[in-house]
A protein has these predicted regions:
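Soluble small-group transferase modules, centered on the S-adenosyl donor enzyme superfamily
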Residues: 86-133
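The AdoMet/dcAdoMet-binding core of the Class I SAM-like
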Residues: 1-77, 83
Length: 133
């Protein structure tokens, strides 16, 4: 009952909507040569993040270099991580030669971010509660 599929300009929808969503799926890129420029910006990703409900998730499918050797892939990754620093997972979808550094074929890069309370605690030799966590 609470599923909603929206077909309209993503950026405009996020500007106008005040709704929060449990799951937001971004899959607007068909190749690295057809990327809507306004959908790879800090401003756009901040709008997406603002529409994620507590305990919600944002799933992003980006087309780029699996080794992040191209400037485009590096800058998109930097942009996403600027807005979604933690907890963010990244996975290459499809076959990938981990030894390829330059000229690798583009692949789908899946990012998943969870809207959880941030926790910046770390384990140190003097403060290690890993056994209890």
């Amino acid at each position: 009952d609470n599923k909603k599929f929206v077909v309209q300009d993503a950026n405009q929808f996020l500007k106008e909507s005040g709704e929060l969503f449990d799951l937001i799926v971004l899959d607007t890129y068909s190749s690295r040569h057809i990327i809507p420029l306004d959908l790879v910006t800090v401003e756009y990703f901040a709008r997406v993040k603002a529409r994620s409900a507590p305990d919600g998730a944002v799933v992003m499918n980006i087309v780029g270099s699996p080794s992040f050797s191209s400037p485009l892939s590096q800058k998109i990754d930097n942009t996403i991580r600027r807005v979604f620093p933690f907890p963010l997972g990244r996975q290459v979808i499809g076959s990938f030669d981990g030894w390829c550094r330059r000229g690798c074929p583009d692949r789908n890069l899946m990012y998943v971010w969870y809207n959880l309370p941030e926790n910046s605690d770390v384990y140190t030799i003097n403060k290690n509660s890993a056994f209890y966590d």
